[in-house]
Amino acid sequence: MTATKAPSEPRSQQAVRRPGDRIFAGSAKASGVFILLVLAGVAAFLVSEAVPALTAPAEDVPGGEGLGAYVAPLVLGTLLGAVLALLVATPLAVGIALYVTYYAPRRVAATMGYVIDLLAAIPSVVYGFWGLAVLAPALVPFHVWAADTLGFLSFFAGPASTSGRTMFTVGLVLAVMILPIISAISREVFSQAPALHREAALALGATRWEMIRMAVLPYGKSGVIGGAMLGLGRALGETMAVAIVLSGGAGATLNLISSSNPSTIASNIALRFPEATGLGINTLIASGLVLFVITLAVNMLARWIVNRRADFSGAN
Amino acid sequence: MTLSTRSRAVPLTMALAGTLALSACGAANESGASGGGGGGGADTQQLSGDLVGAGASSQQAAMEAWQAGFQGEYPDVDFSYDPVGSGGGREQFIAGATDFAGSDAALDDEELTAAQERCSGGEVFELPNYVSPIAVIFNLEGVDELDLQPATIAGIFTGAIANWNDPAIAADNPDATLPDQAITPVHRGDDSGTTDNFTDYLFQTAGDVWTAEPDGVWPLPGGEAANGTSGVVGVVESTAGAVTYADASRAGDLGVVSVGVGSEFVAPSAEAAAAVVENSPAVEGRGEYDFAIEVNRQTEGSGEYPIVLVSYHIGCIQYDDQAAADNVKAFMSYVISEDGQQTAADNAGNAPISESLREQAQTAVEAITAG
Amino acid sequence: MSTDTRPAAPAPVQPRGPVRVERRLPRLAPLGLYLAGVALGAGLSALTGSSLSSTVVYGVVLGTLAVFLASRLVEGRRKATDRLVTCLVTTAFGVAMVPLVSLVWTVLDNGLARFDATFFSNSMFRVVGEGGGAYHAILGTLVITALATVISVPIGLMTAIYLVEYATGRLKRAITFFVDVMTGIPSIVAGLFAFALFTLLFGNDVRLGVMGAVALSVLMIPVVVRSCEEVLKLVPNELREASFALGVPKWRTIVKVVLPTAIAGLGTGVTLAVARVVGETAPLLVTVGLITGTNLDPFDGRMATLPVFAYYQLTQPGTDTQAFLDRAWTAALVLIILVMALNVVARLISRFLAPKTGH
């Protein structure tokens, strides 16, 4: 309560402080602090379980070459898959959100938004089996083509996987999974763009795209980035779908289309944890800690990007 | 049996649970459960309470069958088995969270000491109750079976033998028409007892080709990996020229390898798997009721199939609690019974244990007491 | 794929000014041009060795190009860009529909085999091989997810309110930042955390439905906060100021003005959060365990849940593999239907509660 005594807006200082106000503000603040406590609890748990792996001699850690060598390819795999997913999903999601809010006929727009939301409702195990049974085989011709024509890029060096269960496929599966998250939030933000701005733009003779570019996109940018970050968080931490689709476990490589791919941190934990014992468990949890730190770094970067321009928000 | 009243309930949330309970009065197949158990006519003692196990997911299908049969005889026992994995199973048992563990590996010495402490300083039983042959299966047009020596199998999985028309394969299969097709070896991506047993087999029988130490995690870098038995079988089914190792019961329409044992080639079968387990030496320095074995991979015995997964049930000879002792005793004696083994085999495709193993296990089961 | 959705909805009618008369393509011309481009693309792909994917790719590219070029020549640069974007945005929507349709079809195709009365009325209690159902797992999932929602939504929503309406300075930055970090917690870690917490409190052999709810809440709260925050930020300040000017206390302004205005977005946010956790397998297995019978009391013992049920039916099938796979796919189908139903409920609630707008 005391910390909120001096809000930035002068208007709240003029309002009379009633008990209801105090209780409401207090419980809101308590919720925020509670979240910090939970997170601190999770972090403390992670660190305390990871310490044995951090201090163990290198040859005792699974793989025999120390924690760094164990985690490095996993980090690469995690970032590779998530970034690929984000690159594919973000433009598509913005497109979908724009289509639903400003292009689709009014009557069907709500239904269409609902249909895309449906993608978010599908459990990740199902995505995994769909990726394995449908998408991976369907992408095999693309893999062969990419190895033949784009082989000069290290991403497509080949040899092409015969099963299609590659980092490239995983990136696409993850993209489909985070698409509804990004598009749902973008849609929400786009539809809230002030009607006055939009109408003013149209009244000045702007085409629909110019109206969107001038009145909608600047307004919705922070929301889109926020949605993308949520999506990235999901993609970084996605476990079962990656575990089912990816043919992982190889060392660090940028090659997206061969059958030897680096695994991701989360899927590696899921695959190895049930049968792990002793230091193996500690090592896996230490890798979970690394994922935690990666998310931290990614979010710092995202904050920095968002904050470079002033927030465009109704509550400011 | 399931709507037990033993409760840690917080009054505030009772309302929620209450409304949900109102709308749901139990599954249709559960109401008549107590009337259904006619199986154990001789056993008139009524058991109740909890029986909790956790461990290897490899036993999951067999455990479903055992549970169904066991609850037919003892409808009042609250049975559950969490397929959390062997490591988790052993850990939870040692910590006293479960009554017994299912595990693809026997306890190591350190765990054994801890387990004895958990069992009031008493003995621990380890019964090899789930035996499953691991088949080398492949997807090759027009070829249903192949004879392969261990060194050839090792060569295929290391990548040294990369084509199905390799002379090493042809030498053992003069009658087969081997196509010019690249081999795609597929291995498990998860940490599994199956991989552990398979690599142990290759390490022991083809040591000069396969030099990696046996491990539950596939020890070679790269190659095609898939998650779980369903995963590897799925990839092999959809990829021409692929080969993997998996529970023999899951081979389906795929080709199956007969592996070289001594001077003959043995196909995976329940009998051959049970035979090798029976003739394998026990782990030394264990207690009276600890029947952990070292599977004899290098066997030359006729009709013995050396690539088997042996999964144990681990529990105490002496429990603190009378109900726990009675329940474990009743469950284990059902599991090792001919009926129990056959029921599991029908559902899970494992190999029923042999008569002499059963007699051996029976001594341990009879020794279970509370104290 | 994208040929059946109209690429160009009629543009807003431009007033014909006195200065100059705009040249415009006839109403149906863009659609015609687009289809012509698609046909050309199909022809081209037939020449270069036809496959469905290359037909679609060539078709969409050429169709878009045809519309753009024609508009560029007739209507000028600005209008052409507009039409190009229309094509791109529609294509994006079409592309997103492909995996959706494929997924839903796959699940329906595999899941309908066991979508029968037995599946909804029976549990797996003493079922071996064929038959059985997911009655226990469906109710278990409902109970645990509801409990997780009951925990997460108040905390998440209040935090979002705090961030948007009250917080300033360092605490605000800390909470915003760490909520984002929290989205990156791997699900298994959340499960282990809940397990460690309850083990600490109640001893080693504890397995409760509520443990699973806590684990799911750890995953759910950041999603609730993040999406609610975005939505609350969009409520125009004018509304708040108008309410303050009428002498309404701040908390009543939030409850009566801000939240109702944002209710549709809040509903979407919460539904997304539920969808995020309802299919989680790993954290539930380590905390809630797995049983074959029905247990509906989240404060007493193990429970069955749909995702765990589906996962183990899929990955550890017995010899009658098809029966296990059928149950697994049907469980997945039921899971999707559950979330869809939730979605509908959320939408109904928001429609009911949302303030009437002017148009």
What do the PLM-derived regions correspond to, one by one?
Chain A
Residues M1-S31, A302-N316:
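Transmembrane alpha-helical segments of polytopic membrane transport and secretion proteins
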Residues E9-S27, L46-L87, P105, A160, ...:
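Periplasmic/extracellular loop-to-transmembrane helix junction in inner-membrane transport proteins
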Residues V16, A85-I116, F129, A302-D311:
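Transmembrane-helix boundary motif in ABC transporter permease subunits
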Residues T55-A72, Y127-V176, S247, L256-I257:
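Membrane-interfacial helix termini and adjacent extracytoplasmic/periplasmic loops
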Residues L76, L80-V88, L92, I96, ...:
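Hydrophobic alpha-helical transmembrane segments of multipass integral membrane proteins
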Residues L118, I122, V126, I182-A193, ...:
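Transmembrane alpha-helices
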Residues R187-S191, A195, L202, L271-N316:
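C-terminal transmembrane helix and the adjacent membrane-cytosol boundary/short C-terminal tail
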Residues A235-G278:
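Glycine-rich helix-loop "coupling/hinge" segments at transmembrane-helix boundaries
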